[in-house]
């Protein structure tokens, strides 16, 4: 994931500039982003997001009358997630990756077609995001380990969001996992 970010920023210097990077100098390396993610307190980012949502709501940009919730897999940076790895036991629950001792074994559908039953296993996490469907902007996010089922966190996400932004009179959209 960090490699993708570094590649994206190098290939989209305008985005890098808008993110605050001085594009006349070398962009941060993989290891700089890795160190940042490991050492930075997620609570700070959550508080910044909350402040931005409240500001955008006050400005009329975020409207919580129509909200949606979905999750996406976040693969851990481990060789066991490498499709070129042919280890027979790479997706056994007792074969925890040494590179990331916090990640868990998860499964996600490899296709959005209802008649296809393709599943992929992965070691990692899940990012659950509540969005304002009108603007498309995120309102709240929660990252869990990959084995956590979507339905078990839905009420927590809605309650946490409602603690700072009222969402009682809204239309709620989610997939069958919730």
Predicted regions and their residues:
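DNA-recognition alpha helix
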Residues: 3-21, 53-54
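Polybasic low-complexity intrinsically disordered regions
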Residues: 7, 30-178
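Phosphate-backbone recognition surface of nucleic-acid-processing proteins
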Residues: 19-34
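Generic structural signal for well-ordered secondary structure
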Residues: 2, 8, 26-30
């Amino acid at each position: 994931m960090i490699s993708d970010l570094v590649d994206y920023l190098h290939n989209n210097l305008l985005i890098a500039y808008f993110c605050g990077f001085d594009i006349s100098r070398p962009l941060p390396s993989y290891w700089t982003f890795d160190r940042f993610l490991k050492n930075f307190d997620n609570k700070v980012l959550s508080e910044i997001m909350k402040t931005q949502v409240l500001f955008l709501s006050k400005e009329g940009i975020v409207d919580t009358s129509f909200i949606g919730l979905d999750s996406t897999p976040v693969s851990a940076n481990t060789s066991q997630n490498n499709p070129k790895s042919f280890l027979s036991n790479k997706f056994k629950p007792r074969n925890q990756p040494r590179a990331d001792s916090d990640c868990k074994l998860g499964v996600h559908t490899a296709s959005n077609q209802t008649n296809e039953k393709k599943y992929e296993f992965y070691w990692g996490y899940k990012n659950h995001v509540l969005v304002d469907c009108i603007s498309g902007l995120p309102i709240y996010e929660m990252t869990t380990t990959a084995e956590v089922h979507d339905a078990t966190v839905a009420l927590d996400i809605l309650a946490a969001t409602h603690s700072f932004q009222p969402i009682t009179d809204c239309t709620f959209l989610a997939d069958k996992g919730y």
